[in-house]
């Protein structure tokens, strides 16, 4: 993928929840302009339909519009929260495939990222979201530095986390919020797990729900052909005493599997996180807790 350059036009879309006005994205907008980009607002960016930024078809139209415009070099989601999975039947996946460009977002936006990767073989950047990352006055240095790496098409070699099971592997890298991922189960948009290295995280979930979602993941087609699992941060996830611990959930999930695995990788709903290319080719060394992005 070609690196982005100063002067490039970028689309701003809201495929999930409503924005709530220009003030909510102004700091993020200023940051993107400081990088030299020229933001272009999607036609329905400020629309409102219930909790979402317009109807399903309106939000899908904005995605299709962004990928259809040759002058647009990247597509930035401005908010997540909920709703992206609803637009997936209305995306023109062949259009996206013929006009590849990075989609950048986080959290609920991963539903769209996973669908585009599955249906259009595209690469998205997961981990940056203007409304989320500029709740404070400044962007976290790790988010900013890793985003700049992707913008410049620089290689990523990350040491993070702790080992749960040793091993080395290569595969296609995917990353998602666990709840968002499992909402796609049983749909045409759930990823083909064969040959994949999967990073998952979550926030504000009860431990018994984390446990059940992990077991649901374990029952998906081709799970046994997964190459590796990386657990990111599970922020503010708690439970009752009988629920056990998060490590108990991980241990039950890993039972009767043999792929390499690490936990506490710097990705999730915390101020500091890496921005990572979903769909890239990667090497994973659990012995050294190293994720190396080979190409994207």
Feature-to-residue mapping (PLM):
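ATP/NTP phosphate-donor binding region
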Residues: 1-71
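Short internal beta-strands
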Residues: 41-43, 105, 226-233, 262
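Short acidic/histidine-rich motifs immediately flanking catalytic phosphotransfer sites
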Residues: 69-74, 225-226
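N-terminal glycine-rich "phosphate-gripper" loop used for MgATP/nucleotide binding
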Residues: 74-85
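Short, acidic/small-residue loops that bind anionic groups at enzyme active sites
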Residues: 91-115, 123-129, 257-261
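Conserved anion/nucleotide-ligand pocket segment
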Residues: 121-186
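Internal helical hairpin/lid segments
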Residues: 192-241, 245-246
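ATP/nucleoside-binding phosphotransfer catalytic cores, i.e., glycine-rich phosphate-binding loops
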Residues: 237-296
């Amino acid at each position: 993928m070609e690196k982005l350059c100063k002067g490039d036009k970028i689309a701003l879309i809201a495929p999930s929840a409503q924005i709530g006005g220009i003030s909510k994205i102004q700091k993020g907008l200023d940051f993107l302009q400081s990088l030299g980009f020229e933001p272009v607002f999607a036609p329905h960016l400020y629309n409102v339909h219930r909790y979402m930024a317009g109807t399903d078809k309106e939000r899908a139209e904005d995605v299709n519009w962004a990928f259809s415009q040759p002058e647009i070099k990247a597509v930035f989601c401005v908010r997540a929260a909920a709703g992206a999975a609803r637009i997936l039947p209305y995306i023109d996946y062949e259009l996206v495939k013929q006009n590849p460009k990075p989609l950048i977002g986080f959290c609920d936006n991963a539903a769209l990222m996973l669908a585009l990767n599955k249906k259009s073989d595209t690469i998205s950047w997961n981990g940056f979201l203007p409304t989320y990352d500029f709740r404070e006055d400044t962007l976290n240095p790790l988010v900013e530095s890793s985003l700049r790496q992707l913008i410049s098409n620089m290689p990523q070699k990350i040491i993070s986390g702790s080992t749960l099971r040793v091993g080395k592997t290569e595969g296609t890298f995917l990353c998602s919020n666990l709840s968002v991922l499992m909402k796609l189960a049983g749909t045409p948009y759930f990823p083909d797990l064969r040959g994949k290295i999967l990073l998952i995280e979550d926030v504000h979930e009860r431990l018994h729900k984390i446990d059940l979602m992990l077991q649901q993941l374990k029952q998906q087609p081709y799970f046994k052909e997964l190459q590796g699992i990386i657990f990111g941060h599970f922020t503010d996830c708690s439970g009752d005493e009988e629920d056990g611990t998060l490590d108990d959930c991980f241990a039950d999930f890993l039972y009767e599997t043999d792929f390499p695995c690490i936990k506490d990788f710097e990705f999730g709903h915390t101020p500091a996180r890496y921005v990572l290319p979903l769909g890239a080719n990667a090497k994973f060394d659990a012995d050294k807790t190293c994720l190396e992005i080979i190409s994207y």
